[in-house]
Amino acid sequence: DEVDGEFVARGYNIMKGYYKMPEATAAAIDENGWLHTGDLARRTKKGYYKITGRIKDMIIRGGENIYPKEIEDFLYTHPKVKDVQVIGVPDKQYGEEIMACIILNDGETSSEEEIKQYVLDHMAKHKVPRYVDFVTEFPMNAAGKILKYKMREAAVEKLNLQQASKIVTA
């Protein structure tokens, strides 16, 4: 209870596989029939499950698992922040570093230092973003889903991190 882990499911209501896609099926459904959703979830004390993020979005910084959603949820409490996405970017020393991409409320201004201090004042030091980027929009697909892998690719270019250790971006 109260620990994040991958949400898996098995039962008569779970698909047997992807149509004519054996590789995708093998990646999603293990030999015991468990569907690996790719979602991070936490079981509450009452026995309910709460989705807390996506495994592929998890940042591993110096061996620490950092859940972007936790930092995003906190940054939404900043009065100047309209929208935020937290991503992992490659880093030679730690493997990955935290980057917060922030859309400010109309008419607001802020600084990287202000955002970092706000996080440092309320969260563990290892959760403070190394990079803060103020943007006007996030890349999205036709269905309106935010494309974090596109954000990672753009960040690598913008920060000139091509030589840092490679991370999976999709």
Residue ranges and their predicted role:
Residues 5, 10-11, 16-17, 24, ...:
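AMP-binding/adenylate-forming catalytic core of the ANL superfamily
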